[in-house]
Amino acid sequence: MQLHDLNNITDLVPVTESNQVTESNDITYGNGLAWDTPVHKEPVYFQDGSQNPMVYGIRLGDENKLLAGNVSASYELIHNRELVDVCVGEILGPSDIQFSHHYRFFNNKGIFRDIYYADNTIEGYVPVVGDTIRLVAEIINSYNGSTRAGIRFYFQRLECLNGMTSNKYGFECTFTHNKEGSFNWQDQIIRATSILRGSAQSKLNAFVQNCGKLQKPVDNTDIALIRERYLNRLPMQQFGQLMHKYYADKDYTAWGLLNAGTNVLWHPDPKNPKRLTNANFSNNTIVVDGLLQYATDTYDGDTVDPRQTDMFQS
């Protein structure tokens, strides 16, 4: 179990019944299987019929079971339904923040993402432009060991509903699926209740203040530097999409560059606007953390409002 970027862990607050989380009817599945379909960890056998002691198969469903992946013997199977029940009932519900369900994804490899948007109980405003930023909660899991399990929090620009994932400014309570003695993930993960109450506003404040440092013009030389040093891990296709959106939006600032990137990565398919892949999330983090690092490295105290400066008018 790891608590990332969280140093102010306080005593847990007793959990009470809450209806602070609402679920929409607009839920997306990846393959037709229900996200809480039965899942089993089953032995794998050699051709001679003997059991492989090192490998187990994770299979979905009760009949005609679908193989999600092979895992080690020490793999701890965590059911999506149980994880959601704990995260919603013990963390989001008692947090005094109203969360509404946005998106749920589950594919045939057992990758699970469940996303909730927070209300205005906690929000921040980007300096100069005043854009409103709020929290996003994401419950994550996998049945093939490819991702950690738990809950993480990052940000959303309200104006365009772009999600902004960040390893540096976000916070999370996640763990691997490997058994560790008497480790009880249910007991550990509810520590995120006090994390959410104690650290959310300060994390959000730090994020929006650094977004404020992006309110400055960037030219082709700056973009070349950004591409070479800060977005060098972003695939070429996604960088091309980012630049196309950047020029279309005509917000020729570093903030405009970030918003163009998060827009094409959070809304990659106009026909299916909630269709997101693991690559969308990881590339989103590359854009957000890369450009915020650029902002920190190059900040000189000068900012501009692209909506009030002649050089940015169409």
Regions found by a protein language model. Give the residues of each.
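Beta-rich nucleic-acid/ligand-interaction surfaces
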Residues: 98-122
